[in-house]
Amino acid sequence: MWAKTTAFALILAAAAAAQDDEAKKKDEEAKAKIADFKKELKGAKNEKDISHAIEGLGELQHPRVLAELKGYLGRSAEEAVAAAEQIGKYKKDKDAADMLLGAAGARKDKDGIVKCLRYAGDTEFKGIVTKLTAYFRNKDTDIAKESVDSCAKVKSKDAIEPLLGLWKELDGIKEEKADKGGGLGVGGLGGGITGTGGVGASMQEEQLKRKRDLTPAVQSALNKITGEDFKDLRAANDWWRKNKGTFKDLE
């Protein structure tokens, strides 16, 4: 018995030593990769060259590399997008997902925000759903849509009710025909807008575009998260009322 215990202990010790050696090896690889990256930066003549160097750095996934990439999320749009794309490859990684959501909140340029949201979704880390759904009400339809699309990639049941709520708001935007006075009415997000043109008509078109762009995205996201095929909002709500207590995230 003692001999078996000793042998087992030796096996465990050997396995631990092997893991430690592998970790040290990867750490050295990361240091070398970062050193090569910095050398390449010295020869960079423009943002395109820098972005290319960032892509090369991202070929190796390691905490040291991730920390290096983080520093570029606050740079120019092109550099930030290049870094965000590489960070998005860190699947199920909380730090990577949080970095991208933090960058999305800090940036002022639309493309940078959209891409950070997109690559945050690529991490598939479920802990970011609450932050993603906060973008549903963003006035910019493209930003709102990207947050919906990212929820579809994360596939967390925590996104279902916010998505249903958004669908309800969008469903409330009515595509009404012109009334006798030539005006058009719109409900939902900005309801009660009427008029013969000008600002009212412009706001109406904006809301209708939002509805047309976001509704298919919301429907698709709900289908991917639940594995169902909802044809309309009523069907989705009915299903959720019946399954809310037992539904678990799909693998």
Question: Which residues make up each language-model segment?
Answer:
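Conserved hydrophobic register position within alpha-solenoid helical repeats
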Residues: 53, 83, 113-116, 147, ...
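Extended alpha-helical scaffolding segments
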Residues: 150-235, 239-246
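Amphipathic alpha-helical scaffolding segments comprising HEAT/armadillo-like alpha-solenoid repeats
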Residues: 27-40, 62-74, 81, 92-106, ...
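N-terminal leader/linker segments that initiate helical-solenoid repeat arrays
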Residues: 18-63, 78, 198
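Hydrophobic h-region of N-terminal signal peptides that target proteins for export
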Residues: 9-18
